[in-house]
Amino acid sequence: MHTDENLLPISALQHLQYCERQCALIHIENVWTENVFTAEGRVMHDRVHGQGHETRGNVRTAFGLRLRSLRLGLTGQADVVEFHRQDNGVWLPYPVEFKRGHPKTNDCDRVQLCAQALCLEEMKGESIAAGALFYGETRHRLDVAFDAELRAKTEALCVRLHAFIEAGATPVAVYNKGKCDRCSLLGVCLPKSAGTGKSARKWLARQIDELCPGLPPESEITTARDAQSYPERRESSVECPSPLRGDQP
């Protein structure tokens, strides 16, 4: 059982599924930038959350409902929760998550919605059979059944998420065109500069080689992290351009 102090955002489940490095940058290093896709999504969510609540016939609708599960260690906010009146007078929750794009081929959105349902079940003490995903591009609802397989996958991902965050290690960047080019953190993550098989030391060495092509190849680059003592300076007749002397345009 978790406590209020170590609850993690429900949205982190989607980040972890999409890209572990993205999840680490956001939830371990607290890095966030927006692009047109995230901005459009934020505007959509803000509009939905600001509507309060309403009742139409046998359906009560709550917007921006706060959610929490101490069992799963999650907290968040549902875009919409419809409460459908049953024949026995019980109002059964039906979560609806809004997404700006179109249905995905993976389970990221379904897992996030299922996590909301699991939070509601713990809060309300009632079983929730289904919910829906509404996509802004298609303007269509996609019904989602919370079957045993989806529930098990969601709960397992919650355990993995907490272990991942507690480890506190940000994975190295690996460029994936289909994911990276749409990610708002592309300019921070720099997957093309620091991908698999690449290191900051090698990258820095290449930059120095480009600026000072005559520098002896055996010269060492010493970083602040591993430099306990600096090596003796070597005399060199090669001069590197300095922006302080006006050598740079």
What spans do the regions from the language model cover?
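Metal-dependent nuclease catalytic cores that hydrolyze phosphodiester bonds in DNA/RNA
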Residues: 1-95, 99, 206-211, 223-226, ...
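Intrinsic-disorder/low-complexity peptide segments enriched for small residues
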Residues: 11, 202, 239-242
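Residues that form generic nucleotide/phosphate-binding pockets
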Residues: 16, 27, 153, 157-160, ...
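Cysteine-cluster motifs in flexible loop/terminal segments that predominantly coordinate metals
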Residues: 19, 170-216
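Short, mixed-charge aromatic SLiMs
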Residues: 48-50, 137-147, 207-217
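Nucleic-acid nuclease catalytic cores
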Residues: 70-76, 83-169, 176, 181-187, ...
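Intrinsic disorder/low-complexity segments
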Residues: 224-249
